[in-house]
Amino acid sequence: MKKYNKDNIPNELLEAAKFISEDKLKKAEPILRDYLKSDPLDVNAMKLLADIGIKFRAYKDAGYLLIRALDLSPDYDPARLSYANLLYKRQLPFEALEQISILLEKDPTNIQYLTLKAVNLALANQHDNALEIFEIIIKEKNVVNNQLHLSYGHTLRAVGRLDEAIESYKNAISTKVGYGEAYWSLANLKTFDFTNEDINEIKSLLSNKDCKIDDYYHLLFALGKAEEDSNNFESSMAAYVKGNSIRSKQVPWDSREFSLECDEIIDFFDEDLIKKFKDVGDKNTDPIFVVGLPRSGSTLIEQILSSHSLIEGTTELQNIIALSRKIANKKNSSSKSEYPSALIAMDKSQFKEMGAAYIKNTLDQRVTDKPYF
């Protein structure tokens, strides 16, 4: 691994780092790509480019870069930390925990490593272990950080300690003025009531021209809930509409394109296709899962089914989504998806491999008191 000091850092890396610090990622990306063409073994450049990829949700490319960097330089801890963060964002907590364990062996009291371990334990439904770490960081090490208090609040909420969750969200707000996500987390508890003073405070924060966009739309959603609870329905709807309008500019969404994709999937998976693929795939009968759409009632169905003594409920899993993305084989956001058409060209062995991989990758989620699988 190349070691740089202030006198020998390549100009390209300095320029890219400057753009990254200014959040001008689209300017930094081509600089790093061009630099890596001339020096393909520079793990520092790989890590910087991977971090940009993570922010753009180009997880496949970012993962390749970080794995390559760690192959070349296993002791490059910043790259390993980025890789652990990537795995967390991909909702692969057990894989992330493996990377974090390597980091903690070297630096067992590192707050950043411990925090990342805690949030991954929470993601893996190991809430008690996560809370233990959060409480060491917050109560024993006296670390003050808005994101830390927010994550701690989420974990407290998951185990039903709602009063403590509220306190933690309020601590997050006191740590960072105008922290929109914490206000929205309070609103999303459904049991928390904003006071008139709270509502006026949110309105004041929204009028601040320095309010960042992420805070802004979260504050609008919180205001919408607060006004709704106060029966000010017109003001509530106005806040929700404005918040969603702002949020929609950050999330790539084309309703017409989505409708066409749904129509294509419905037409593709017809009776003839199902008959053709009847005997392919992994023969294991382990998983019981409900496939549905957000806001369609599938969560309620899952809750009803999982109350049965022989059915095991997990959490919302990303494995099917990840599998469909793998089949889609999109190189970037503008390239055409190969899903579902690519299924036609697959042979029986590929279906069996995908089924077996699904079983394997969901085993870690089976941590309830009904281990029938």
Regions found by a protein language model. Give the residues of each.
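Alpha-helical solenoid repeat scaffolds of the TPR/TPR-like class and their adjacent stem/linker regions
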Residues: 1-365
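Conserved two-lobed SF2 helicase motor
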Residues: 371-373
